[in-house]
Amino acid sequence: LGSENPEISQLHSRRLREQTNLTETNNDRTRLRRAIASFSALQEIKLLRLQDEADEYLVDFIRDHSLGTSTSTASIRFDWETACSRAVTNLSIALLASKCSSIRFTGPQISPEATLQLLHAPSTTLAAMGGRLTSLDINFHSATDITTTMADLSGVFHRFFIAAKNLIAIHIGFLSKTPLDLDLELLFHHIRWKTLRKLSIQGWRLSADEIITLARRHNAQLRDFRLLGVYLRPGGLWRDVLVVLREEMEQLERLVLKDIDYAAHFDSVFDSNGVEVFDDYPAGPVPSSLTVAAGTSSAQSPTTTPLVSDGFPALLRERQLPLRRTSLERLRALSSEDLGDDGVHVLREQRPLWEAWVLSAPHRVKRNGQSHWSM
C-alpha cells in the first residue's frame, strides 16, 4: 500500500496509532464523558458507523491483492463488532455519569455481539439508563440469523424495558432479508408503556395474535404504528390484524405497512441456491389518484404506491375489489373481506389501500378539525 498510494498508507498508519493510544489509555472514554457532561440540555445520542473513502480504498486493496491466494476475499471486512461494543459501553458510562435525562437514542447499525455485553451489566445500571430515555430507535445489523443471540438477550430487554417507563417512541428492527424468528414477548415481555405514542417493529416473523396483543395493550394512546418487513406465521391473516387496528386503535393517526407479507411466501421467493425471486408486477410510475398522508409530516408515506386512474391498481381489480372510484364513503364501506387478502401473499399495491382503510374508520379521532389522511 505504501508504494501504491503513500498518502493513504500514511493516513491509515496515523489512524492506527491514534486508535491504539485511545483504547489503551481509555482516553476515548474520558473525552466522551467530558463531552456529554458539557451538554446540559442534551436531547439525542446517535451511534453511527463510519467508513470513509480511505477505508474503502484499503478494503479494495486487500481484496485485489488477495486474488489467487488462500485468503477468502468474502471475509475481508472491518471489525464493527469490536468498535460497536466499545462504543455502547463507553456511551453507557458517559451517560450515567452525566445529568442528562429525556434522551433519544438512535443506533441504526447495532451489533448483536455488542449488545451481549449488557448481559454482564448490573440491573441498577440498566435501570438507570432506561429511565433516562424517551425514545429508543435501534436496528440490529447482522447478515446472518441472530434469533438465538436475541433469545439470550431476553432478560436484558426485560430489565431495561421495565425501567424505561418514559418511552414515547420505540423502534426495534432487524434486517428484513434475515427476519428474526422469535416470539415478540421474549423482547417486549407484556410491558405496557403509558407514555408510548409511536411503535415500530421491523424484520420479524410474527403471528397475527402477537401483533394484535401488542396493539391492544397500547390502543388508548398509540398514534403511530409501523410494521416494516413483518411476515405472518402460518395460522393468521393480515385482515384480522387490520380489523383490530381499524376498530380498536382509538388514537391512531399514522399506519405504515411497508413490505409486509406472509412468512411462507417470503420463504418461497428464494430458490435452492439462495437467489431471491423478485415480484413480477411492474414498478414503474403510473398516474395516481390516491395519496395516504398519515400523520402531520409533509413527506410522502414510504408505502404510498402509484395507482391507476380509477384509484385502484389492476391487480386489485383482478381480485374483484367492488369499487371503481376512490371516496371516503366507499372506502369506509369496504369490509375486511373486500381487501383482497388471500392469506398467501400481500401485493405491493394492496398496502396503501389497507393503510387508508384502517385510518378511514368513522370513529377515528380527528385533530384540528380534520383527519390526518387525505385522498
Model-derived regions, located:
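Leucine-rich solenoid repeat modules
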Residues: 35, 194-375
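Residue-level recognition of the N-termini of beta-strands and the immediately preceding loop/turn
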Residues: 43, 101, 133-134, 168, ...
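A conditional alpha-helix N-cap/helix-loop micro-motif detector
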Residues: 24-28, 84, 119, 149-153, ...
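Active-site-proximal segments of catalytic enzyme domains
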Residues: 135-155, 166-191, 198-202
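Concave beta-strand-loop units of leucine-rich repeat
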Residues: 47-52, 105-110, 138-144, 171-178, ...
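A short acidic (Asp/Glu
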Residues: 55-60, 114-120, 147-149, 181-184, ...
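N-terminal adaptor/linker regions at the entrance to substrate-recognition repeat cores
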Residues: 1-120, 126-135
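Leucine-rich repeat
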Residues: 31-39, 61, 89-99, 120-132, ...
